[in-house]
A protein has these predicted regions:
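Metallocofactor- and cofactor-centric catalytic cores in central/energy metabolism, strongly enriched
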Residues: 2-245
């Protein structure tokens, strides 16, 4: 119901990108229970259910219950950042490359033919929801789930994070061996500009086969307040550097 963020977006640990194209409200609700302002959407919703108990005679007693909820949604799309633990791992590199590919609308060749970037599999981006029925035909009207209310578009996310390995994300995606070589070639330049922040490393909580790649560490191998403060500092600096909401 609201546009994507219009600010330029990118990656906190290097790299940059372009925000998703702003979109207009797809629909408006005309109801005494819904109020629009320039800043918010306020709505009232009555949740109805039935509480059932059994009396002394063993008979069920059904009592209707109503609970009134007041909802308020900000119409301004915030500038949102995501910091991934294990940014240089299989998941971190794949998510980052996927966002880059979608942001740029990339296509690449595979052995099954040409593929294009999409968000299939995402509940928010890849599904629809029923808005209602057509007042004339009675046909269902379905809309993209992400247009139901103001939501951050994944193309607008600012990505950062930590990893025990200091490889840049281009080298890390090669190590992960998840992405098609043709796709990797298209995002390699941007991925090479991104490097994870140093991470805490507690060997007892990480698989032993990861030890050889642990070259990007915050000093210390045991939990401490110093580690907590460093992570907090990283988050504060990430938010400030990228002007996040």
């Amino acid at each position: 119901m609201a546009p994507h963020a219009e600010e330029s977006v990118g990656f906190a640990n290097g790299g940059s990108g372009t925000a998703a194209t702003p979109a207009k409200d797809l629909f408006v609700v005309e109801s005494p229970n819904v109020e629009y302002t320039d800043e918010t959407i306020k709505s009232k919703y009555t949740y109805r259910t039935t509480a059932v108990s059994k009396n002394a005679n063993g008979k069920y007693v059904a009592v209707p219950k109503e609970t009134l909820y007041d909802f308020k949604v900000d119409r301004k799309i915030p500038k949102l950042g995501v910091m991934l633990i294990g940014l240089g791992g299989n998941n971190g590199t794949t998510v980052t490359a996927g966002i880059l590919a979608n942001r740029r609308g990339l296509e690449w060749e595979t052995k099954e033919g040409k593929r294009g970037a999409n968000y299939y599999g995402s509940v928010i981006m890849g599904s629809t929801t029923k808005l209602g029925v057509d007042s004339e035909t009675g046909a269902d009207i379905n809309i993209p789930f992400h247009d139901l209310m103001p939501m951050v578009h994944p193309n607008d996310l600012v990505i950062g994070g930590w990893d025990i390995s200091g490889l840049n994300l281009a080298e890390a995606m090669d190590r992960a061996k998840v992405l098609e070589p043709t796709l990797k070639s298209l995002v390699r330049k941007e991925m090479a500009q991104m490097k994870p922040l140093p991470s805490i490393y507690y060997p007892d909580f990480i698989a032993a086969n990861q030890e050889d790649r642990a070259d990007n560490l915050i000093p210390g191998s045991k939990a401490s307040m110093a580690h907590i403060e460093q992570i907090r500092k990283d988050i504060r600096e990430f938010k400030a550097a990228n002007d996040l909401d």
